Amino acid sequence: MKFTLSWLKDHLETTATVPEIVAAMTMAGLEVEHVIDPATKLAPFTVCKIVEAARHPNADRLQVCQVDTVDGRKEIVCGAPNARPGLTTIYAPIGAYVPGLDVTLVEKPVRGVVSNGMLCSAAELEYASESDGIMELEGSLAVGTPAVDALGLEAVIDFEVTPNRPDWLGVAGIARDLAAAGVGTLKDLSIAPIAGTYPSPISVTVDGEACPAFAGRYIRGVKNGPSPKWLQDRLTAIGLRPINALVDVTNLISYDRARPLHVYDAHKLSGTQISTRLGRHGEHGDEHLIALDGKTYELTPEMCVIADANGERPIGLGGVMGGESTGCSEDTVDVFVESAWFEPIRIAQTGRTTGIASDAQYRFARTVDTGSLVPGIELATKLILELCGGEPSEVVYVGEVPAAPKGFAFDPDYVGQLSGLAVTPEKTHQILAALGFDVVLGSPWTVTPPTFRRDVEGKADLVEEVARIAGYGALPSTPLPEVPRAVGGILTAKQARARAARRALAAAGYAEAVTFSFTNRKTASLFGGGQDVLVLANPIASELDCMRPSLLPNLIEAAGRNARQGFADAALFEIGPTFHGDKPADQRTVVSAILAPKAPRGWDKAAQGDVFTVKADLLALLEELGAPVASLQTAQGSASSWWHPGRSARLQLGPKAVMAEFGEIHPAVLKALDVAGPVFGFEITLEAIPEPKKKSIKTKPAFSPSALMPLTRDFAFLVEKAKAAGDLVKAAAGADKALITAARVFDVYEGPGVPDGFKSVAIEVVVQPREATLTDAEIEALSAKVVAAAEKAGGKLRS
């Protein structure tokens, strides 16, 4: 949003300078982006007068001019066709930077004649986009007058408008806030109604869903043409291109009062009725409109359409842009002025669908003051009559705008309670009244927001209004209270585990990925998700329409993208939430990792990773997280459907206490995701890891190694092929925890001597005597315990 100081002074009686205005705006919450001051870039340029102009001796199209300048009389070579004696124009001295040409002037001969400066065009000063010759100014201007003063240029303030303050999209709204902040006195913003002299020959019908309210007025006998200089200068200063008086009036009011309007050429209308309705879908597709920008747009049933010819011919996109067929030109004689209120969400969606980002669309999408329909018509009528003449009809008003905001109770003491500011009730009343709020004093007060402040919905909003105008700089400096450090740190157990997992996996060579919390519904269904309650109503992209049931699909797709870019060897992990329903309890925090090994180009072709690699990384990570790894059961063949059934397993404390799953991703899943395999991975549910027992505050005794040598005993057991060797190892190690310090598999054999359907698992058991060397009888008794424990686990000692 841009405006000039002189424009602001149309609504604000003030002596403040631009820097003071900018400072006050910043303190009041208006975020100033920058100030465009033409005096800076045009400082070297001044008014001059051509005294003589003679043809250049060496060039037919050039003239050698004698020019009176601020630096005295100068000889300047000029190629402009309108250079002539007596012309008052703009002079640029040697050394001046010409912004429109992006050059700095140097003294040099032009076809043999030295030019001591330059005579400038409007385009060269960036005063206009194009020009046919040097500038022609009023002859009464004194030589040496700064170009900025001669052209009436002034600083332009550009600031960012927050979505909740559409009233700031008009200069009058800015003036209101600055007046409340004490920068000046707000002038009367009311608009006197203009009586119509005849009934409007154009009637209006509205579809409340498309356009809740519509005001219009017929004005006959106008004389359209270029706008006066003051209006053109005002629009040009903020970057708008003047078109003609009728159109420029609507643009002025849009920026002056944040009230978009539209003007129709009444003679180009078909019939005597204008209708607002939703777009229609016919036998041959949706309707189309050629808009004022010359482009053709498809009108869908979600859009508001302005139509004539008994509602059959679209002539505009309501709240967005008018149609080319009814646009005003210099030949326009009779007009119909539109001032309507459109539903903001519909206008925002129309803008996104069509790609139109007009000033009207920008304002209606943020909501326009519902109380400005008739005042907007009256102001437009006043300006049109002043600039174009004509005779107005009575105002046509149909429909109903949303109800005005309701009042609510407010205690002025709440300002101090919530903000800490010491503001008297009298000052609070003064601020709220200056901002346009209706305040009824009492116990408590009753405060009603104005129609242009629908963002104010409660007493906390009122405190914010008072605080920003009173000034946050008035807040007393109060140090924060000292908070004792939390015992055991400030992280929860889950947060601490997530941090530990992140460090451990990074140390193991995995790279962390951060992906979206949603995925494609079809992809989610591959991983046990995709339920209706998890589908997004308004996804950020069509391929991200469902909350993720697992971190694995996003990681696998990331590995696939890396592979397509030439980085096939991927080791990725992510820590984040997964979603299994619409209740808070259905959200779980998960640690997932994948390994997509690529076989090196060597003679052995061995890939750098497999199921056992990710299992080892998984167990190491669980150990780091404090999980009871020694108590975990490996349940093979019971993992989820997205794992390879023969190359995956679960780690669990019991059938209902599943802690993690690992293995190779099912080839069918990889094919559906268009990712080359194999891909291995694991997934840990942090909530499934039991909380560690409180550590004893007693100091552990110093390590005291045994003075006796350990001994080993080997056992070979027959077990079914499907039996996990780890079960035998765990059973053997637990046979006598006082003496057995370790047990491990050193051989697995299948072949002659082993029955079909069985395998031989050889286990080495390490025995560490504590107090005395074990006798043969004690060793035999210990061996018997190992055999008995193995038999309970399904093993049979080979004879």
UniProtKB/Swiss-Prot annotation:
The record places domain B5 at: 403-477
Pfam assignment, any one: B5
EC number(s) from the headed UniProt entry: 6.1.1.20
Instruction: Supply the InterPro entries for this chain.
Output: aa-tRNA-synth_II/BPL/LPL, B3/B4_tRNA-bd, DNA-bd_dom_put_sf, Fdx_antiC-bd, Fdx_antiC-bd_sf, NA-bd_OB-fold, Phe-tRNA-ligase_IIc_bsu, Phe-tRNA-ligase_IIc_bsu_bact
* Catalytic activity reported: tRNA(Phe) + L-phenylalanine + ATP = L-phenylalanyl-tRNA(Phe) + AMP + diphosphate + H(+)
Biological process terms in GO annotation: phenylalanyl-tRNA aminoacylation
Q: Which keywords label this protein?
A: Aminoacyl-tRNA synthetase, ATP-binding, Cytoplasm, Ligase, Magnesium, Metal-binding, Nucleotide-binding, Protein biosynthesis, RNA-binding, tRNA-binding
Q: Which positions in this protein are listed as binding Mg(2+)?
A: 455, 461, 464-465
- For this protein, what does the record note about how its cofactor is bound? Binds 2 magnesium ions per tetramer.
Q: Kindly give the PROSITE patterns that the UniProt entry links to this protein.
A: B5, FDX_ACB, TRBD
| UniProt subunit comment | Tetramer of two alpha and two beta subunits.
**The protein's name in its UniProt record:** Phenylalanine--tRNA ligase beta subunit
This chain's source organism reads Caulobacter vibrioides (strain ATCC 19089 / CIP 103742 / CB 15)
- This protein's gene is called pheT
